[in-house]
A protein has these predicted regions:
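Acidic, proline/glycine-rich low-complexity intrinsically disordered segments
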Residues: 3, 10-11, 18-32, 38, ...
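Residue cluster at the C-terminal edge of the helix-turn-helix DNA-binding motif
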Residues: 50-57
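Juxtacatalytic C-terminal regulatory tail of Ser/Thr protein kinases
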Residues: 56, 72-79
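Minor-groove-contacting beta-hairpin "wing" of winged helix-turn-helix DNA-binding domains
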Residues: 62, 66-71
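Acidic, Ser/Thr-rich low-complexity linear motifs
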Residues: 218-221, 284, 438-452
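Terminal, low-structured helical/coil segments at or just beyond the last alpha-helical repeat
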Residues: 442-469
Length: 469
């Protein structure tokens, strides 16, 4: 019979299980379970009490004045999601002015809060990570031992008037290797706006690099030994594959993650996404979409503050042609995490579907700026907004970036060429849709794209009709 814990109690139990046999300080537990949020010890005590009530009084031992430890004699806990732990250490102030110390610390704290919003990476709060300054390689193992971090973010900030230069690097502490580093600089009036813009760019890229590093580790392990988080990463990689050919493989990884950890809300969310993408983006059957919505609902019930859950729910509602609900969930996702490039991009796509392509292009440009190594679909969504604005040549150029165009991409590209008057290229795209493929370009234009307004579907269909001759 399954046992149920609230998300915070479960996160606490998970961290204790990862540190079996070690006394975990209260400050560390509070940083991991409530990242970037100030809470009192009462919250921690309440979660420990809940674990003991569900699993037994002896499950968690209190070590006076030190912390808590999972009982060594307890039965081995099932594998847990094992999210990576990131510590953002205090940045170096290279301005030469002690008055800038508060600004430099505030910048690093903004990074902590930004990374914490993703919910896919555990980031330690400043009272732990700021106990270290930016140390050299020799001190990295010490940081890992003392605060349990897998990755370290360090850097520096220099200000000269309104000119800001930030250097940042991401370090894998276990291998003592730098995974990523970059420099950001900005000119202009309004120091707060400059700082916010740089934070926005860094946060998204940091999370992407940590996720990619986790995927590389997971790819080297046998599937049977993967933790739930690693299984999730393997499935996520298949969903972002430009070839878009293995959604079933992605589903299998998400299902395996759920089997390992039945309370892993994000695994239900991504399984819902994989199901919703069945049928080439928005053309899945009503039954498939309802199943996807049920899975997304469960994911949100388990992880109500997970922004990805609302983003996926938004996409499913869009595919179900419930445009108001789609925008409602999208705005919640952005409120929970305004740094996520995928959410920013998806907001642009949604606005195109709602008949607001000019607004959409602003959002899409911001998503591309935050994530220059963005997935392929960013450009495809941008192309549709451009088409709706009558910018057919720019739309075609964006679609031409596809290396293995699916029939729906060829249909949109044919419509662009036809609207430009290049009928030879338009008909070539139609001809390249394989013989015997049940895909109908005109049906796709009229019913396969989840436009809110019939006039937008007719606009796309107009180009397709021209291409069909």
């Amino acid at each position: 019979e399954p046992l149920f814990l609230r998300p915070k109690a479960y996160a606490l139990l998970s961290h204790l299980a990862r540190n079996m046999g070690r006394v975990v300080p209260k400050s560390e537990l509070m940083d991991v379970v409530w990242p970037g949020v100030y809470v009192t010890e009462d919250s921690l005590t309440q979660s420990v009490r809940e674990i003991r009530k569900v699993l037994g009084e002896d499950m968690v031992r209190t070590v006076s004045k030190r912390g808590y430890m999972l009982a060594a004699e307890a039965e081995a806990a099932p594998e847990i999601s094992s999210q990576p732990i990131v510590a953002v250490v205090r940045f170096r102030n290279e301005s030469g002015d002690p008055a800038d110390e508060a600004m430099v610390d505030g910048f690093a704290e903004d990074l902590i809060n930004g990374v914490a919003r993703f919910g896919t990476v555990t980031v330690l709060a400043r009272n732990s990570s700021f106990s270290f300054a930016s140390f050299g390689r020799a001190e990295w193992p010490q940081i890992r031992a003392r605060i349990g971090a897998d990755y370290l973010v360090e850097g520096s900030l220099r200000r000269q008037g309104e000119h800001v230069v930030v250097a940042v690097s991401l370090v894998d502490i276990a291998t003592a290797s730098q995974l990523w580093g970059d420099r950001y600089q900005s000119h202009g009036e309004g120091l707060f706006a400059i700082e916010r813009e740089i934070v926005e760019q860094i946060v998204s890229r940091l999370v992407t690099r940590v996720t990619n590093a986790g995927l590389e580790h997971a790819a080297r392990k046998p599937v049977t030994s993967l933790a739930a988080y690693e299984l999730l990463l393997r499935g996520f990689a298949l969903l972002r594959d430009p070839a878009q050919t293995d959604q079933r493989g992605a589903e299998a990884f998400f299902e395996a993650a759920i089997a390992k950890d039945p309370n892993y809300g994000l695994a239900y969310t991504y399984l819902a996404l994989a199901r919703a993408l069945d049928g080439e983006f928005g053309r899945a059957s009503d039954a498939v979409l309802q199943n996807a919505r049920d899975l997304a609902d469960k994911g949100l019930a388990l992880s109500p503050d997970q922004p990805t859950g609302h983003r996926v729910q938004s996409l499913i509602r869009l595919y179900m042609r419930d445009h108001e609900a789609a925008e409602h969930h999208m705005r919640i996702a952005l409120q929970l995490n305004p740094y996520d490039a995928d959410s920013i991009e998806q907001m642009g796509m949604l606005l195109t579907m709602r008949g607001r392509p000019l607004d959409a292009l602003t959002w899409l440009a911001r998503g591309i700026r935050i994530d220059p190594l963005h997935p392929h679909w960013y450009q495809f969504d941008r192309a549709l907004a451009l088409y709706m604005m009558g910018e057919y040549r720019q739309a075609a150029e964006a679609l031409e970036l596809a290396t293995r165009p699916a029939p729906w991409i060829r249909t949109r590209l044919a419509a662009c060429y036809a609207q430009m008057g290049d009928m030879e290229k338009a008909r070539r795209q139609i001809a390249l849709i394989e013989d015997g493929d049940p895909f109908s370009p005109l049906d796709y234009a009229l019913r396969g794209v989840p436009f809110e307004n019939r006039a937008d579907a007719e606009h796309l269909a107009e180009g397709v009709r021209l291409a069909l001759g």
